[in-house]
């Protein structure tokens, strides 16, 4: 039981800014880390629902509530996945050979394409929440999206565990070596099944389309990782997580209008 608690602490310490008690980053304490990774999405989803509910309940201006909703994931995670999105965008846009792309991922400087990607990413989120935060009925769509923050992390964890690694000495490779691959993968698959059921239960068509969209983006992630990098890395995993979430959000923004 203590080992599971330590794995929980390591997962939250690594992938969020939520204060956690100290835990040694040993192999035993990282073995089941990915089993707890999706629960960071639970926190983001819960806060998203809370902000949306309070915004409707107390009549705050839609623009203000929308801005807060956009920033919730950044506040919870510290932007760790957005960093991966921007680094990967720079690498993909360079059109260099594979080894050079991997070097760009490690470069701490933001290129022009990273800046453009950041602007597009946050504007897309603002547009989505502007569309969704316009009626109590659309709280169902926000509810589906809140579960989507867990779906993206389940798929991201499965990718880290099962995809080839682009670098043998990277963070993802280290996490994968220390994790219990089969058990963690199976737990994440069970989570996915339950989350898909929950999304469909809230609103069958909306939930189904959002979940299928996430799976298609996961396929695209695998394609990009293998074709351009020879495997996945922490940055590419963050890239996937960001486009998966905003992709589900865009789908919900469109279908909720019908």
Short names for language-model regions:
Residues 75, 79, 105, 120-161, ...:
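Selected alpha-helical membrane-embedding segments in polytopic membrane proteins
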Residues 35-89, 142-148, 206-227:
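Membrane-embedded alpha-helical segments that form the functional core of polytopic membrane enzymes
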Residues 30-46, 91-135, 144-145, 182-199, ...:
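Multi-pass membrane catalytic core of lipid/isoprenoid biosynthesis enzymes
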Residues 22, 57-61, 134-136, 161-169, ...:
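Transmembrane helix-loop junctions in multipass membrane proteins, especially transporters and channels
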Residues 47, 51-55, 72, 76, ...:
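Alpha-helical membrane-inserting segments
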Residues 72-110, 222-244:
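Acidic (Asp/Glu-rich) catalytic motifs at the cytosolic membrane interface
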Residues 154-189, 228-229:
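Solvent-exposed interhelical
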Residues 1-26, 164:
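Membrane-proximal soluble regions of multi-pass membrane proteins
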């Amino acid at each position: 039981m203590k080992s599971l608690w330590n794995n929980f602490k390591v997962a939250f310490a690594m992938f969020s800014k939520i204060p956690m008690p100290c835990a040694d980053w040993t192999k035993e304490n990282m073995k089941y880390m990915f089993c707890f990774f999706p629960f960071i999405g639970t926190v983001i989803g819960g806060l998203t629902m809370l902000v949306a509910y309070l915004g409707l309940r107390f009549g705050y201006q839609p623009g203000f509530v929308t801005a807060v909703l956009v920033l919730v994931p950044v506040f919870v995670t510290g932007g760790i996945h957005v960093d991966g999105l921007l680094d990967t965008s720079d690498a993909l846009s360079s059109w260099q050979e594979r080894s050079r792309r991997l070097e760009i991922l490690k470069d701490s400087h933001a290129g022009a394409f990273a800046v453009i990607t950041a602007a597009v990413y946050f504007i897309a989120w603002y547009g989505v929440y502007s569309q969704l935060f316009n009626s109590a009925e659309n709280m169902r769509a926000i509810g589906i999206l809140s579960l989507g923050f867990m779906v993206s992390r389940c798929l991201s964890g499965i990718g880290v565990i099962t995809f080839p690694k682009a670098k043998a000495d990277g963070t993802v490779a280290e996490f994968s070596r220390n994790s219990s691959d089969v058990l963690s993968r199976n737990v994440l698959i069970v989570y996915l099944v339950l989350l898909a059921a929950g999304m469909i239960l809230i609103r069958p068509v909306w939930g189904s389309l959002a979940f299928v969209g996430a799976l298609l983006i996961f396929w695209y992630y695998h394609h990009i990782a293998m074709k351009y990098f020879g495997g996945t890395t922490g940055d590419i995993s963050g890239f996937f997580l960001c486009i998966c979430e905003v992709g589900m959000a865009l789908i919900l923004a469109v279908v909720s209008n019908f």
